[in-house]
Amino acid sequence: MMGYQTNSNFSMFFSSENDDQNHHNYDPYNNFSSSTSVDCTLSLGTPSTRLDDHHRFSSANSNNISGDFYIHGGNAKTSSYKKGGVAHSLPRRCASCDTTSTPLWRNGPKGPKSLCNACGIRFKKEERRATARNLTISGGGSSAAEVPVENSYNGGGNYYSHHHHHYASSSPSWAHQNTQRVPYFSPVPEMEYPYVDNVTASSFMSWN
């Protein structure tokens, strides 16, 4: 029994001695470095990790954009992206001829800058003609005979209102002469010479 205990004690002592030797020879840094290599920057949030995160975020955005570009058939104009917070607007069209190119946009019946240059000029002309017709109808019409004409003889005024007076004042003197009785020869010899009243006797009977 004693020999067994001695052997057991010896074995226990030997094992404990080996444990102490292993404990003194244990280096946690060497064992940790030999088992695996760990980058300490992953847990500290250093610039290198932030740069990696930014690179991954940029890669994800580029993949999404390329996917959307593929879905829209490669047509960048039909995409619904917003630049600067403003969506792409449709090109302006003329309300009359549906053109999209013009040197100048003009106001029309549908609002400001709703007509192209040519349609805007035509619309303005028609608007002026309609306004002139309305003024003519409301004013009872106008004619050239009603327009006053400057009379150089009377120093102004309406020519038609003073025309009769001007004609009377500028007529020749023989028009105001009294009628005179002028004898003429009768075909019957026994009859007396009759007399006729003639205003213009002095002009065409100068032989008398």
UniProtKB/Swiss-Prot annotation:
Keywords: DNA-binding, Metal-binding, Nucleus, Transcription, Transcription regulation, Zinc, Zinc-finger. One of its GO terms (molecular function) is zinc ion binding. It is found in: Nucleus. Pfam families: GATA (PF00320). PROSITE patterns: GATA_ZN_FINGER_1 (PS00344), GATA_ZN_FINGER_2 (PS50114). It comes from the Eukaryota. Its main location: nucleus. One of its GO terms (cellular component) is nucleus. InterPro entries: Znf_GATA, Znf_NHR/GATA. The keyword Nucleus applies. SMART domains: ZnF_GATA (SM00401). The keyword Cell division does not apply. A zinc finger (GATA-type) spans 94-119. CDD domains: ZnF_GATA. Transcriptional regulator that specifically binds 5'-GATA-3' or 5'-GAT-3' motifs within gene promoters. Belongs to the type IV zinc-finger family. Class B subfamily. This is GATA transcription factor 20. It comes from Arabidopsis thaliana (Mouse-ear cress).
